[in-house]
Amino acid sequence: MSNISVIGTGSYVPNDIITNDFLSTIVDTSDEWIRTRTGILERRISKEENTIYMATESAKEAIKNANIDANDLDLIIVATLTPDNFMPSTACSVQKEIGAINALCFDISAACSGFIYGLEIACSMLKNSFRNKALIIGAENLSKIVDWEDRNTCVLFGDGAGAAILSKTKEEGILEFHSGSNGLKGEHLTCGVLKANNTSNKNDRLEKNNFIKMNGKEIFRFAVGAMNETICNIQEKTKWDLNEVKYIISHQANSRIIEYTAKKLNTEKDKFYMNLDKYGNTSAASIPIALDEMNKRGLLNKQDKIILVGFGGGLTFGGAAIVWSI
């Protein structure tokens, strides 16, 4: 059976920057309060860009980086909790924009774990079918579902998209996964839909319930536990010592979560790649944006061992062990 490798990456973030100082003018907060509790200095916010546009731009970059044609793609999976439409799917819209006429396309919703879930689904589909190449995208427009009057959430989130191309290969590549869900604790991180009554009565109003709501303490506790469990499980499956692992690329939610996880694993914080100071929490986009940034910066070399790990709403979690092949 063929192995599956990452052969290209891409990303897109909006140009508009919202700083901590700006947020201090609209809610009761400060740059010092946000920095010390989250590690975030600024985040990117879309104005004209929607989820489809950002996903498409990241896809174009990944295709170019992989040195393939869009027609080579057999599968497109988009992980997002902020689609522009219920239908067509974001993946089908990306297919149209890039001309990937041969690809099977669908979206998944697993919040901040979405990119990891997408990788696992794609690997399974490639290994067990005639399909050879897949495009996995994490894309989010979180600024549209943030309550800008809630200082506990509006300081955390940003917009962006990241993508990776997977291909069958004879080389080592994506080796192992560990993933799971805990719906029993789903109420700790929620975002409702816009409720409609399907009535012609002009006096009926839509109830706006589509803001992110979060129990920060419970999510922090879950995140540290899920990260630790996932990394340890992947170590057990691969027999990797953490000293062999060049980087751990985690979901970029909060620097304190990463620091606590590093302590529990008895490893240095610098092993965890972080860029949340620039982008904040971009949910499903955070891991692929970081992966592309590292690829562009030349931080990853062929045969480097890396671990991806995510956690998020659902509640969900997941991780992957990868031998880098670019």
UniProtKB/Swiss-Prot annotation:
<dbReference type="GO" id="GO:0004315">
    <property type="term" value="F:3-oxoacyl-[acyl-carrier-protein] synthase activity"/>
</dbReference>
<comment type="similarity">
    <text>Belongs to the thiolase-like superfamily. FabH family.</text>
</comment>
<comment type="pathway">
    <text>Lipid metabolism; fatty acid biosynthesis.</text>
</comment>
<dbReference type="InterPro" id="IPR013751">
    <property type="entry name" value="ACP_syn_III_N"/>
</dbReference>
<keyword id="KW-0276">Fatty acid metabolism</keyword>
<keyword id="KW-0012">Acyltransferase</keyword>
<keyword id="KW-0443">Lipid metabolism</keyword>
<feature type="active site">
    <location>
        <position position="281"/>
    </location>
</feature>
<keyword id="KW-0808">Transferase</keyword>
<keyword id="KW-0444">Lipid biosynthesis</keyword>
<protein>
    <recommendedName>
        <fullName>Beta-ketoacyl-[acyl-carrier-protein] synthase III</fullName>
        <ecNumber>2.3.1.180</ecNumber>
    </recommendedName>
</protein>
<dbReference type="Pfam" id="PF08545">
    <property type="entry name" value="ACP_syn_III"/>
</dbReference>
<dbReference type="GO" id="GO:0033818">
    <property type="term" value="F:beta-ketoacyl-acyl-carrier-protein synthase III activity"/>
</dbReference>
<feature type="active site">
    <location>
        <position position="112"/>
    </location>
</feature>
<keyword id="KW-0511">Multifunctional enzyme</keyword>
<dbReference type="InterPro" id="IPR004655">
    <property type="entry name" value="FabH"/>
</dbReference>
<keyword id="KW-0275">Fatty acid biosynthesis</keyword>
<dbReference type="GO" id="GO:0005737">
    <property type="term" value="C:cytoplasm"/>
</dbReference>
<dbReference type="GO" id="GO:0044550">
    <property type="term" value="P:secondary metabolite biosynthetic process"/>
</dbReference>
<comment type="subunit">
    <text>Homodimer.</text>
</comment>
<feature type="active site">
    <location>
        <position position="251"/>
    </location>
</feature>
<dbReference type="Pfam" id="PF08541">
    <property type="entry name" value="ACP_syn_III_C"/>
</dbReference>
<dbReference type="GO" id="GO:0006633">
    <property type="term" value="P:fatty acid biosynthetic process"/>
</dbReference>
<feature type="region of interest" description="ACP-binding">
    <location>
        <begin position="252"/>
        <end position="256"/>
    </location>
</feature>
<comment type="function">
    <text>Catalyzes the condensation reaction of fatty acid synthesis by the addition to an acyl acceptor of two carbons from malonyl-ACP. Catalyzes the first condensation reaction which initiates fatty acid synthesis and may therefore play a role in governing the total rate of fatty acid production. Possesses both acetoacetyl-ACP synthase and acetyl transacylase activities. Its substrate specificity determines the biosynthesis of branched-chain and/or straight-chain of fatty acids.</text>
</comment>
<dbReference type="InterPro" id="IPR013747">
    <property type="entry name" value="ACP_syn_III_C"/>
</dbReference>
<keyword id="KW-0963">Cytoplasm</keyword>
<dbReference type="InterPro" id="IPR016039">
    <property type="entry name" value="Thiolase-like"/>
</dbReference>
